[in-house]
Swiss-Prot record:
Subcellular location(s) of the protein: Cytoplasm
Annotated HAMAP family: SmpB (MF_00023)
Entry's Gene Ontology BP terms: trans-translation
The protein's role, per its UniProt record: Required for rescue of stalled ribosomes mediated by trans-translation. Binds to transfer-messenger RNA (tmRNA), required for stable association of tmRNA with ribosomes. tmRNA and SmpB together mimic tRNA shape, replacing the anticodon stem-loop with SmpB. tmRNA is encoded by the ssrA gene; the 2 termini fold to resemble tRNA(Ala) and it encodes a 'tag peptide', a short internal open reading frame. During trans-translation Ala-aminoacylated tmRNA acts like a tRNA, entering the A-site of stalled ribosomes, displacing the stalled mRNA.
Name under which the protein is recorded: SsrA-binding protein
Length: 164
């Protein structure tokens, strides 16, 4: 019998949620990967895709990093003896060196820490990508929009030129 391919291709199903607003509002200078401390009902809800990262952010308290504002909606079939708080703050699992670096940059240079995306790693672990950056000004956002529109227009023009 022939062996089946054991390797799985990395596809988009590993992605759970994206914070599209973060890339529009912030200019990221560094990105990091962090684990999340979750409860059982949260993992089940995440598997069902009931996550919203749009209004969430990371804050530092007593030398630890916490994800605040991330909504994980409980399932209707969740047990009755567990109290499900969809908006609770969740601890980020980072190394001490990374925590100290984040704390220093947030305190001294005024950086913000924002979650960018949530995804599965190796099919079992929920990871979150956080970005360390500064907020964009209104003119920066307009410049980005103009650049994006120019790229689209350029692609259309090239497509028309190739078809003729």
């Amino acid at each position: 019998m022939a062996k089946k391919n054991a390797k799985k291709s990395k596809n988009s199903s590993a992605s759970i949620a994206r914070n599209k607003r973060a890339t529009f509002d912030y200019k990221f200078e560094e990105k990091m990967e962090a684990g999340l401390s979750l409860m059982g009902w949260e993992v089940k809800s995440i598997r069902m895709g009931k996550v919203n990262l749009s209004e969430s952010y990371v804050f530092m308290r007593e030398g630890e990093a916490f994800l605040f504002g991330c909504t994980i909606a409980p399932l209707n079939t969740a047990s009755t003896h567990v109290v499900c708080d969809p908006m609770r703050s969740r601890k980020l699992l980072l190394k001490r060196k990374e925590l100290d670096k984040l704390q220093g940059l947030v305190d001294r240079k005024g950086y913000s820490i924002v979650p960018i995306s949530m995804y599965w790693q190796k099919g079992a672990w929920v990871k979150i990508e956080i970005g360390l950056g500064k907020g964009k000004k209104e003119h920066d956002k307009r410049d980005d929009t103009k650049d994006r529109e120019w790229q689209i227009e350029k692609a259309r023009t090239m497509k028309k030129a190739v078809q003729q």
